[in-house]
C-alpha cells in the first residue's frame, strides 16, 4: 500500500412446507391458563412443562435422551381439570415423570437372527443382523439406538429372491401379516397399542416387482424426525419428481444438471403451497412459517427453477392468493410479494380448521372447465405442500379430496400405467399437538420415499430448510451462502479470503480477497510489491488455520503505483487488481464457495435473466445510473461483518469523486480524473445515508451487490480518502468527505476473461 494515502487493505426445486403444530409457548412460571385449570400438581418429575394454545394445553419437556411418561401433552377440560394421566394400556398414573428413551425390539425377523436380544434397548446400544444360508442381507447389518428412540440405518431384510417381489421386510417395532410375495399378493402391518403407524398399512406386490405404498414405521408421540432425516428424505423424493419431468423432455440430467433445469413455464410442474391459518396455529407461528416460505421461494428461484405456484391459506374458509393460471405464477418475485401481503388476521373472524375446503381450492386450480382437458394436462406433475397440524374440526374428511384429485389426474386407474409420479402430497407438522394419524392419511405413499414429516419445533424446521437447500450438488454455484442462525462467519461469507504478506524486517501486510474459482482468489494489486516471494504470501479461506500454497500472483499489466510520480501524484491506483493462483485445487464446501463475477453465465442464472442476456444488460442490472445498495465485508474483533454502503453511480457520482482531493498527496491535483479514472466506483459520505468506511485490512476484498438471494462482486476495494481506523478501531464520527474507491470489475473484464479462461466460468 502507499505511505501517504489510505488504501483500504481490506431439482430441481427444493420445496419446504412450513407450519407450526399449533404451539404458542409460554414459560409455566410466567403465566396461567386463560381457562380455569390450575397449575398445581401438574409438574413432571425430572423435567418441566410449557403452556400451549394460550393455556388450554400443556406440553411436558424432558432432557435429551428422556421422554415424558405417560403422555407428552395434556388439555384443559371444560370441567376445570387437566386430562388424566393414562398409560397406553389405560392405567391411571398420579404423577408424570421423565423416563429414559428406549428403542423398540424387533417383534420378528424372518430368515435370520439378530443379536443381542433384549426386551428393550438403551440409547447407543447396537444390534446386529445376519441371514441363514441361502439368504442375502439387504439393508443395514448393524444398527444403533438413537437419542430420538429410532434405530439408525435401514431395515434389515433376509431374502432368497424366490418371490415375484422382494421381501418387503419387517421394520423394527412393527408386526407383519403375510409371507407370500407373488404378483398381487399383499402384506399388512400393525403397531403395538399406543403407537401410531406411519406409512402404508397395506402393501401390494405390483407388476415390475415393486411394492405399492411406502415402508411403515411405528411412532410414539415423543418421536420427531430430525432435521437431517427430513432434509434427506424430502430432497430425495422431490428430486425424483423433478428428474421425471426432465426425462419427458428428452433430457437425462446428471447430478449437476438436475439443479439447473428451468422447467417449462407452460406447466411441467405445478407446486401448491397450502398454509393453515386457523386459531390453533397462532400469529407468531403463522408469521414465522410465512417468512420461511418467502425465503424458500427465493432459494428455489435462485437455482434457476421456474415451477408455477399456487398459494392457499385457510381456516374456516380457504383464500386463494395465487393461482397456477395467473400469468406471473412462475415469477418468484411476484409470488413472494403476494405471500408477504398475507396477514394472519385475514382468517381471524372465522378461525376454524377446514382442511377439506383448502384442498378443494387446490382441486379447483387443477381442474379444467367444461371437462375438456387442456393440451399437455397428462404431462404436468403436481406437488402439494400441506402445512397443517392435522387437527381439522369442520368440513369433513379431507382425504376424500385427495381421492378426487387422484381421480382427476387419472392416477391409480391403470395398473400398467398408474401415473403415481404425477402427484406428490407432502405434509409437514411441527410440535407436540400434531395428529399423526391424520397427516399420515393425507400424505403420498411411494416406495423408498417419505412424504409425511413431524419435527419438534420451528427451529428444527428451519434447520431442515437450510440442510435441504445446501446439499452438496449446489456447492459450485456462485454467490450462494448459508444464512443460518448456527452459521459461522464463513458460512455467511464463504468466498472471503484472508491474505497476509510477510516481509522480513518490515512487518507484514494484511489484505482481503474473494474466491472466484477453484484455483483463483481475486484481490488488490497494491497488497504486494515486486519483491514479495510466493512463499511469503499466506492465504486462508473458510476460516481454516492452514495456509494455502501460492503458485503465482498475476497483476493487471496496466497497474503501476508509481506511474504518475513525475506528475506530482505519489501513488496511482488505476487497475489495482491481482489474481492469486493457488497450487492446489480448492475443495468447495459450506464455508468455501465462489462469489459471482460480472458477465458470466453463473451471474446470468443468479440474476434469473434469460440465457441470451448480454454483458451490457448485466451491467445495467447491477450498476444502473443511480445510488446502488452494496456491501463489503470487514473484520472487527476477529469477526467478519457485512457493511452496507451505496455506490454513487447517479447524480452524486461527481461529488463523491471530487472528494478524492482530500486524500493525503492529492490536495494539489487540479484535475481529479487524473487519480479517479473511469475504472473506479465510489462509496462513502453521508448521502443518501452515512456509509461506513473501509479499513486498511479490508483492501482487496469484494464490493458486492446482493440481489435475488445471490452475491455478485462488482468491485475490488482499493483505497480511501480518510483512515477511519487509526487506532485499530473504526471511528464512529467521520467527515462527510470520507470516501472509498473500488476497481470496477466491468472495466477489467478482458483481463479477467484471459486469466480465468480455463476456470469454466462461462464469460459472456
Swiss-Prot record:
<feature type="site" description="Cleavage; by CFD">
    <location>
        <begin position="259"/>
        <end position="260"/>
    </location>
</feature>
<keyword id="KW-0460">Magnesium</keyword>
<feature type="domain" description="Peptidase S1">
    <location>
        <begin position="477"/>
        <end position="757"/>
    </location>
</feature>
<feature type="disulfide bond">
    <location>
        <begin position="131"/>
        <end position="158"/>
    </location>
</feature>
<keyword id="KW-0677">Repeat</keyword>
<keyword id="KW-0179">Complement alternate pathway</keyword>
<feature type="disulfide bond">
    <location>
        <begin position="478"/>
        <end position="596"/>
    </location>
</feature>
<dbReference type="InterPro" id="IPR002035">
    <property type="entry name" value="VWF_A"/>
</dbReference>
<keyword id="KW-0165">Cleavage on pair of basic residues</keyword>
<dbReference type="InterPro" id="IPR035976">
    <property type="entry name" value="Sushi/SCR/CCP_sf"/>
</dbReference>
<feature type="disulfide bond">
    <location>
        <begin position="656"/>
        <end position="682"/>
    </location>
</feature>
<dbReference type="GO" id="GO:0009617">
    <property type="term" value="P:response to bacterium"/>
</dbReference>
<feature type="domain" description="Sushi 1">
    <location>
        <begin position="35"/>
        <end position="100"/>
    </location>
</feature>
<feature type="active site" description="Charge relay system">
    <location>
        <position position="576"/>
    </location>
</feature>
<dbReference type="GO" id="GO:0004252">
    <property type="term" value="F:serine-type endopeptidase activity"/>
</dbReference>
<dbReference type="InterPro" id="IPR000436">
    <property type="entry name" value="Sushi_SCR_CCP_dom"/>
</dbReference>
<feature type="signal peptide">
    <location>
        <begin position="1"/>
        <end position="25"/>
    </location>
</feature>
<dbReference type="InterPro" id="IPR001314">
    <property type="entry name" value="Peptidase_S1A"/>
</dbReference>
<feature type="disulfide bond">
    <location>
        <begin position="103"/>
        <end position="145"/>
    </location>
</feature>
<dbReference type="InterPro" id="IPR011360">
    <property type="entry name" value="Compl_C2_B"/>
</dbReference>
<keyword id="KW-0325">Glycoprotein</keyword>
<keyword id="KW-0399">Innate immunity</keyword>
<dbReference type="InterPro" id="IPR033116">
    <property type="entry name" value="TRYPSIN_SER"/>
</dbReference>
<keyword id="KW-0391">Immunity</keyword>
<dbReference type="InterPro" id="IPR001254">
    <property type="entry name" value="Trypsin_dom"/>
</dbReference>
<keyword id="KW-0378">Hydrolase</keyword>
<dbReference type="Pfam" id="PF00089">
    <property type="entry name" value="Trypsin"/>
</dbReference>
<feature type="active site" description="Charge relay system">
    <location>
        <position position="699"/>
    </location>
</feature>
<dbReference type="Pfam" id="PF00084">
    <property type="entry name" value="Sushi"/>
</dbReference>
<dbReference type="GO" id="GO:0006956">
    <property type="term" value="P:complement activation"/>
</dbReference>
<feature type="glycosylation site" description="N-linked (GlcNAc...) asparagine">
    <location>
        <position position="378"/>
    </location>
</feature>
<feature type="disulfide bond">
    <location>
        <begin position="62"/>
        <end position="98"/>
    </location>
</feature>
<feature type="disulfide bond">
    <location>
        <begin position="165"/>
        <end position="205"/>
    </location>
</feature>
<keyword id="KW-0720">Serine protease</keyword>
<keyword id="KW-0645">Protease</keyword>
<feature type="disulfide bond">
    <location>
        <begin position="37"/>
        <end position="76"/>
    </location>
</feature>
<feature type="binding site">
    <location>
        <position position="280"/>
    </location>
    <ligand>
        <name>Mg(2+)</name>
    </ligand>
</feature>
<dbReference type="GO" id="GO:0006508">
    <property type="term" value="P:proteolysis"/>
</dbReference>
<keyword id="KW-0732">Signal</keyword>
<keyword id="KW-0964">Secreted</keyword>
<dbReference type="InterPro" id="IPR009003">
    <property type="entry name" value="Peptidase_S1_PA"/>
</dbReference>
<comment type="subunit">
    <text>Monomer. Interacts with complement C3b; this interaction is dependent on the presence of Mg(2+).</text>
</comment>
Amino acid at each position: 500500500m502507499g505511505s501517504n494515502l489510505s488504501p483500504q487493505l481490506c431439482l430441481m426445486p427444493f420445496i419446504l412446507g412450513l407450519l407450526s403444530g399449533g404451539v404458542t409457548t409460554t414459560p409455566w412460571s410466567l403465566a396461567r391458563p386463560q381457562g380455569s385449570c390450575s397449575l398445581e400438581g401438574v409438574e413432571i418429575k425430572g423435567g418441566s412443562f410449557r403452556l400451549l394454545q394460550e393455556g388450554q394445553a400443556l406440553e411436558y419437556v424432558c432432557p435429551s435422551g428422556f421422554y415424558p411418561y405417560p403422555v407428552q401433552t395434556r388439555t384443559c377440560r371444560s370441567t376445570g381439570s387437566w386430562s388424566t394421566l393414562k398409560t397406553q394400556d389405560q392405567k391411571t398414573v398420579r404423577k408424570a415423570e421423565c423416563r429414559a428413551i428406549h428403542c423398540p425390539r424387533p417383534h420378528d425377523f424372518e430368515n435370520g437372527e439378530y443379536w443381542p436380544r433384549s426386551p428393550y434397548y438403551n440409547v447407543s446400544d447396537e444390534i446386529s443382523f445376519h441371514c441363514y444360508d441361502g439368504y442375502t442381507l439387504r439393508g443395514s447389518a448393524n444398527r444403533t439406538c438413537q437419542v430420538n428412540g429410532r434405530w439408525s440405518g435401514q431395515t434389515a431384510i433376509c431374502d432368497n429372491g424366490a418371490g415375484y417381489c422382494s421381501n418387503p421386510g419387517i421394520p423394527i417395532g412393527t408386526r407383519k401379516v403375510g409371507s407370500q410375495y407373488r404378483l398381487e399378493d399383499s402384506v399388512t402391518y400393525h403397531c403395538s397399542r399406543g403407537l401410531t403407524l406411519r406409512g402404508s398399512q397395506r402393501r401390494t406386490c405390483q407388476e415390475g416387482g415393486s411394492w405399492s405404498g411406502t415402508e411403515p414405521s411405528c411412532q410414539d408421540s415423543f418421536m420427531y424426525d430430525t432435521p437431517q432425516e427430513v432434509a434427506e428424505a424430502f430432497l430425495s423424493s422431490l428430486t425424483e419428481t423433478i428428474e421425471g419431468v426432465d426425462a419427458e423432455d428428452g433430457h437425462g440430467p446428471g447430478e449437476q444438471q438436475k439443479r439447473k433445469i428451468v422447467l417449462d413455464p407452460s406447466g411441467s410442474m405445478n407446486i401448491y403451497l397450502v398454509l393453515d391459518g386457523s386459531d390453533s396455529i397462532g400469529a407468531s407461528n403463522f408469521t414465522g412459517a410465512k417468512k420461511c416460505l418467502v425465503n424458500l421461494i427465493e432459494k428455489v428461484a435462485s437455482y434457476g427453477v421456474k415451477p408455477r405456484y399456487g398459494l392457499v391459506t385457510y381456516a374456516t374458509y380457504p383464500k386463494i392468493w395465487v393461482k397456477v393460471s395467473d400469468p406471473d405464477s412462475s415469477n418468484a418475485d411476484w409470488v413472494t410479494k403476494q405471500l408477504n401481503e398475507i396477514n394472519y388476521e385475514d382468517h381471524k373472524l372465522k378461525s376454524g380448521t377446514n382442511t377439506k375446503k383448502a384442498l378443494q381450492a387446490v382441486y379447483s386450480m387443477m381442474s379444467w372447465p367444461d371437462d375438456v382437458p387442456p393440451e399437455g394436462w397428462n404431462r404436468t406433475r403436481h406437488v402439494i405442500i400441506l402445512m397443517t397440524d392435522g387437527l381439522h374440526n369442520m368440513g369433513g374428511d379431507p382425504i376424500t379430496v385427495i381421492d378426487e384429485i387422484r381421480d382427476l389426474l387419472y392416477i391409480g386407474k391403470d395398473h400398467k400405467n398408474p401415473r403415481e409420479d404425477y402427484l406428490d402430497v407432502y405434509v409437514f407438522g411441527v410440535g407436540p399437538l400434531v395428529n399423526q394419524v391424520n397427516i399420515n392419511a393425507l400424505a403420498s405413499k411411494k416406495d423408498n420415499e417419505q412424504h409425511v414429516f413431524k419435527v419438534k419445533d420451528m427451529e428444527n424446521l428451519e434447520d431442515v430448510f437450510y440442510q435441504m437447500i445446501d446439499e452438496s450438488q449446489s456447492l459450485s454455484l456462485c454467490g450462494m451462502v448459508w444464512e443460518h442462525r448456527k452459521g459461522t462467519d464463513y458460512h455467511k461469507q464463504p468466498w472471503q479470503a484472508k491474505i497476509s504478506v510477510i516481509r522480513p524486517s518490515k512487518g507484514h501486510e494484511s489484505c482481503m480477497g474473494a474466491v472466484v474459482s477453484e484455483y483463483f482468489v481475486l484481490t488488490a494489486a497494491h497488497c504486494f510489491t515486486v519483491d514479495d516471494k510466493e512463499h511469503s504470501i499466506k492465504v486462508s479461506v473458510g476460516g481454516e488455520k492452514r495456509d494455502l500454497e501460492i503458485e503465482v500472483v498475476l497483476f493487471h499489466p496496466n497497474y503501476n503505483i508509481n506511474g504518475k510520480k513525475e506528475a506530482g501524484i505519489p501513488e496511482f491506483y488505476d487497475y489495482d487488481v491481482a489474481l492469486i493462483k493457488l497450487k492446489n485445487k480448492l475443495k468447495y464446501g459450506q464455508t468455501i464457495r465462489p462469489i459471482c463475477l460480472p458477465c458470466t453465465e453463473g451471474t446470468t442464472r443468479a440474476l434469473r435473466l434469460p440465457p441470451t442476456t448480454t454483458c451490457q444488460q448485466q451491467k445495467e442490472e447491477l450498476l444502473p445510473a443511480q445510488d446502488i445498495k452494496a456491501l463489503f465485508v470487514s473484520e472487527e474483533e476477529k469477526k467478519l461483518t457485512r457493511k452496507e454502503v451505496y455506490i454513487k453511480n447517479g447524480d452524486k457520482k461527481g461529488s463523491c469523486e471530487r472528494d478524492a482531493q482530500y486524500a493525503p498527496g492529492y490536495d494539489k491535483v487540479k484535475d481529479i480524473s487524473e487519480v479517479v479514472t473511469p475504472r473506479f466506483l465510489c462509496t462513502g459520505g453521508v448521502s443518501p445515508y452515512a456509509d461506513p468506511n473501509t479499513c486498511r485490512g479490508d483492501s482487496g476484498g469484494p464490493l458486492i451487490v446482493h440481489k435475488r438471494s445471490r452475491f455478485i462482486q462488482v468491485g475490488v476495494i482499493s483505497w480511501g480518502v480518510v483512515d477511519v481506523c487509526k487506532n485499530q478501531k473504526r471511528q464512529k464520527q467521520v467527515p462527510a468527505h470520507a470516501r472509498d474507491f473500488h476497481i470496477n470489475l466491468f472495466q477489467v473484464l478482458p483481463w479477467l476473461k484471459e486469466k480465468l479462461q480455463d476456470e469454466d466460468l462461462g464469460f459472456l
